[in-house]
């Protein structure tokens, strides 16, 4: 029977944590897929099973699932809850020396590439959707381009760990994914403001907004990282030091949001500072061990919960025949846009990039989309336009994680790490 009253935060948390724990056990015990992919596959199958039972007249299960999901604000859970910790945990183990070495491809792909990809996807969608009876205003297509273009660090970094990609390519993909989600969120929020107000901002306003939110987030993250570094260096007690990192992440993200700065970029910068300078100069071996262990567990647990939620949310989407075909073409459009951005970058700057020959294959296929895209599309105003974009977003995200995520390792193995990019 479906819930008849609102559940408390504790009850909702208990339900989803229990589901996640059970699915991770089933995956580890019987299936053996990477955890994030495995739990999402199982949760999708459960959702499809509930839908099928609903068609047969047994609709209690799907009613309960829908009612439960409606009481959960996915956008708030991810953007205001999980994201800060996941980004910090990811950046904590990224070598800043490697980032500096590959700063050119990371910078181009994360900043320019995100904007170019958003424009390409928006234009293609604008002309493709009317063929299937789903014409959308160009601004809505731009919103979709902005939310689907960033590669998701949560999805990318979890899968790259076991993909076998050459170190240089792994660094570029991980570095790009850590930064471009912040850029994508800023662009999305800017476009959403235009949609809500109906006013078209000037170029100066757009540039100022991007500079304040993105640039301010980076500077704020560096300041937070410096403060945290000096606090960690002044004591030697792993319990307090772990607590300081947790407080810095949650409190810092809240402050960044309050001051309208990019919280994601702030967390990335703070994670890089603590994970590099802090790890080398401000932590004892014992503290380093416990901080690494704590954030590894946080990363694994939150990732598992996130991908379970993505799988369960499938029941909220209604696909028609034409929309299903349009979703398939949208997957192709997203991949082609990614290929063009990566191809232009590697072709134009191949002498400066210092990447293995054929790196474009992994950079293209390894550009996974994930929970951030879902969280952003759920922020759109309710209506027919949002329903269309929600279906398209889920198609791209699920294909990205299941198909690209499971096969990117094979693509990576085809790259010889000792050869440099000469040409696509």
Give the positions of each predicted feature.
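Transmembrane helical cores of multi-pass secondary ion antiporters/exchangers
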Residues: 1-424
């Amino acid at each position: 029977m479906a819930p008849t009253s609102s559940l408390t935060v504790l009850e909702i948390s208990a339900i989803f944590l229990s589901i996640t724990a059970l699915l991770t056990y089933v995956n580890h015990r019987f299936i053996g897929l990477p955890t994030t992919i495995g739990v999402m596959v199982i949760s999708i199958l459960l959702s499809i099973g509930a839908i099928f039972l609903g068609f047969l007249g047994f609709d209690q299960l799907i009613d309960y699932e829908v009612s439960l999901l409606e009481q959960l604000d996915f956008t708030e859970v991810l953007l205001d809850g999980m994201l800060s910790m996941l980004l910090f945990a990811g950046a904590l183990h990224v070598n800043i020396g490697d980032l500096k070495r590959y700063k050119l491809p990371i910078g181009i792909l994360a900043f320019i590439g995100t904007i170019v990809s958003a424009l390409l996807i928006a234009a293609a969608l604008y002309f493709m959707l009317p063929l299937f009876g789903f014409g959308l205003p160009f601004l809505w297509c731009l919103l979709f381009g902005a939310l689907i273009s960033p590669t998701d660090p949560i999805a990318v970094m979890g899968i790259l760990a076991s993909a076998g990609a050459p170190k240089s390519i792994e660094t570029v993909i991980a570095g790009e994914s850590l930064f471009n989600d912040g850029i994508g969120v800023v662009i999305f929020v800017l476009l959403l403001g235009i949609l809500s107000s109906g006013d078209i901002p000037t170029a100066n306003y757009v540039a100022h907004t991007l500079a304040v939110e993105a640039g301010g987030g980076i500077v704020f993250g560096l300041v937070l990282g410096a403060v945290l570094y000096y606090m960690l260096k002044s004591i030697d007690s792993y319990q307090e030091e772990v607590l300081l990192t947790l407080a810095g992440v949650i409190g810092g993200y809240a402050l960044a949001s309050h001051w309208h700065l990019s919280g994601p970029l702030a967390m990335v910068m703070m994670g890089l500072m603590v994970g590099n300078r802090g790890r080398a100069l401000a932590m004892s071996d014992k503290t380093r061990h416990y901080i690494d262990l704590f954030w590894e567990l946080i990363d694994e647990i939150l990732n598992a919960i996130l991908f379970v939620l993505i799988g369960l949310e499938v029941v909220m989407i209604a696909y028609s025949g034409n929309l299903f075909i349009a979703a398939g073409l949208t997957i192709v459009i997203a991949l082609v846009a990614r290929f063009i951005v990566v191809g232009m970058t590697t072709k134009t700057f191949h002498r400066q990039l210092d990447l293995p020959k054929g790196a474009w294959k992994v950079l293209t296929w390894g550009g996974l989309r994930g929970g951030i895209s879902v969280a952003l599309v759920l922020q759109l105003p309710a209506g027919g336009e949002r329903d269309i974009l929600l279906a398209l977003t889920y198609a791209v995200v699920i294909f990205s994680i299941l198909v690209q995520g499971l096969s990117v390792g094979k693509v990576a193995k085809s790259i010889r790490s000792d050869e440099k990019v000469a040409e696509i």
